[in-house]
């Protein structure tokens, strides 16, 4: 079975998501058993299907954390993570506007990086990521549906040497299993809805996804106040977050709640 090379410190590999072998069938079975097994009450509702899928990644693969982000009308939305630390890692990527998840989705490639490469390739994100999380390696895989990239799966490792233990085939097989699970769940939702309606995927109603929508609301507030386009409003939010050592999602939440004044952010 092909495996990700042991990158060591400073190693980075970009791999086309096509290397799948028959040996991965066992991984597929284990993954299905992990996410379809008895869920704890906190993740039993349909909205938290991506959380169950992310936790199953950690059970089946030699990784420390996992996070799943999907695209919604050109916006990247976090829909599920294995734990709070994996959630924070995704939020750091979004705050800095760079990182492996973004590159995997943009380049339609599997991204593999150890600590030194994380710092080199994404300096702003890398500095915060290595400072505020225990992770020292990351593998990001594009999530594809009907030939289109619809998001990315981040796999985080506390020991960068474990990058050499993670099979490309296993990672891609798990990603395909995630895509299938989400597609089936959404099809079931659609079948229960009037034919003229296009229901929103239930996982976009999760708390992590709803929290991200506050960023778009905050952007709208800045666009109106400053008379700037959306990209500039997002840049202002990122600059304020960086200058105050804060996560962009938290800054947006404070703006929407009114505990932070727009004038303070635009200075």
Enumerate the predicted regions with their spans:
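Signal-transducing coiled-coil/dimerization helices and immediately adjacent hinge/linker segments
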Residues: 187-267
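A short, aliphatic-rich beta-strand micro-motif
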Residues: 136-144
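Short hydrophobic/glycine-rich mini-motifs in sensory/regulatory modules
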Residues: 143-153, 178
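Short regulatory/linker helices and ligand/cofactor-binding micro-motifs at input modules
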Residues: 27-47, 110, 201-208, 217-223
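Regulatory sensory and allosteric helical modules in signal-transduction proteins
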Residues: 67-71, 77-79, 86-123, 127-136
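Allosteric cytosolic regulatory segments
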Residues: 168-180
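Intrinsically disordered, low-complexity terminal regulatory regions
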Residues: 1-95, 236, 253-267
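Short beta-strand-to-loop transition segments that serve as allosteric relay/switch motifs
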Residues: 152-162, 166, 182-184
